[in-house]
C-alpha cells in the first residue's frame, strides 16, 4: 500500500469532464447527482468536491466540470476505481462525454 511519508498529505484524484455537444442539461445534471452520490456509496472516499469552470483564461479546452476526491492511500483510490458503483457510474457517464481528464497527486499541507 502506497501511503505518503507525511501523514498530513492527502491523495487527490482530479476528474475533469468535457461533455458532448449533444448532452442535454438533464444529462449533465444526472451526471452531477450520480457523481456526488459516490461519496456515500464508496467508503474509501474521504471527501468529494466539485464545481464548474469559471476561469477567464480560456484554456479549459472545453472541459466544464471538475471533481476532486480525497483518499488516504493509493490502495483506497484503487479500491474506488474497481468499486462496482464507480464502474456503474462510468457506464452512465460514458455516452455523454466527449473527453475526460484524470490526474492524481499527493497534496502537501
Segments (PLM) and residue ranges:
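Short S/T/G/P-rich N-terminal loop/turn motif that feeds into the first structured element of a domain
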Residues: 1-64, 72-82, 105-109
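C-terminal partner/receptor-binding element of secreted or periplasmic proteins
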Residues: 96-102
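Short, structured active-site "lid" loops
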Residues: 68
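A common structural junction motif
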Residues: 36-42, 87-90, 97
Amino acid at each position: 500500500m502506497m501511503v505518503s511519508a507525511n501523514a498530513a498529505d492527502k491523495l487527490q484524484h482530479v476528474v475533469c469532464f468535457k461533455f458532448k455537444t449533444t448532452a442535454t442539461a438533464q444529462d449533465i445534471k444526472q451526471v452531477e447527482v450520480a457523481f456526488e452520490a459516490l461519496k456515500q456509496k464508496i467508503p474509501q472516499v474521504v471527501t468529494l468536491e466539485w464545481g464548474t469552470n469559471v476561469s477567464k483564461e480560456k484554456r479549459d479546452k472545453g472541459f466544464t466540470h471538475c471533481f476532486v476526491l480525497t483518499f488516504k492511500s493509493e490502495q483506497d483510490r484503487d479500491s474506488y476505481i474497481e468499486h462496482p458503483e464507480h464502474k456503474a457510474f462510468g457506464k452512465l457517464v460514458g455516452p455523454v462525454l466527449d473527453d475526460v481528464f484524470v490526474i492524481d497527486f499527493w497534496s502537501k499541507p
